[in-house]
Design a protein with these regions (language model features):
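Beta/alpha (TIM)-barrel catalytic core signal, keyed to glycine-rich beta->alpha loops juxtaposed to Asp/Glu
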Residues: 1-182
């Protein structure tokens, strides 16, 4: 953001860190070049990027960079704004005011294209006694640089479902099948 240059922002954050007013500094949605600029001024402990099984743009450069630099990743939107819940199918309409209403990713054409993939992923999850949500969160947790996954629950059952994403994992051949489905 040109209004808040990285150098100026990170200099201020480093001053707060040195004064003991903040212990750790994290950034959100930075690319590798931005993190390099920031690291030249101030240590960074975490990055909060958009990351899900359907949006894996960070895997090529950001994920390896953060692992090398010891920066913990705290992914947001791990369920792709609800796409990885399996609830949204062609014909679904969001109410006025919902941020997903009118977004291309939720149009019928995209939902139609995703449906077979989501069904196949759901079948893999169910074979392990898990849900698509749990598989989707677990996939991110298996990345060494991911410190935790930022999920939100509207009710206790959703929170319980999210907790069930940890403490298990697919076999290598199952992950290979997940990769094949997502290609």
């Amino acid at each position: 953001n040109a209004e808040y240059p990285i150098e100026k922002t990170m200099t201020a954050m480093d001053a707060l860190r040195r004064e003991g007013k903040v212990r750790y500094v994290g950034v959100s949605n930075f690319n590798v070049d931005q993190m390099r600029q920031a690291l030249a001024i101030c240590p960074i402990q975490s990055l909060q990027p958009r990351y899900s099984l359907l949006d894996r743009h960070i895997e090529d450069d950001i994920l390896p960079f953060c692992e090398r630099e010891g920066i913990g990743i705290l992914p947001h939107s791990p369920l792709a704004k609800g796409l990885l819940t399996g609830k949204y199918r062609p014909g679904h309409r969001f109410p006025d005011g919902d941020e997903r209403a009118g977004r291309e990713v939720f149009d019928d054409e995209n939902l139609e294209r995703l449906a077979p993939k989501l069904d196949a992923l759901t079948a893999i999850a169910r074979a392990r006694g898990k849900s698509l949500v749990q598989l989707s969160v677990n996939a991110l947790l298996r990345q060494p640089a991911v410190a935790c996954v930022l999920v939100g629950g509207k009710n206790p059952s959703q929170v319980a479902e999210h907790v069930g994403a940890q403490g298990w994992g697919l076999k290598d051949e199952e992950w290979s099948e997940v990769e094949r489905i997502l290609k």
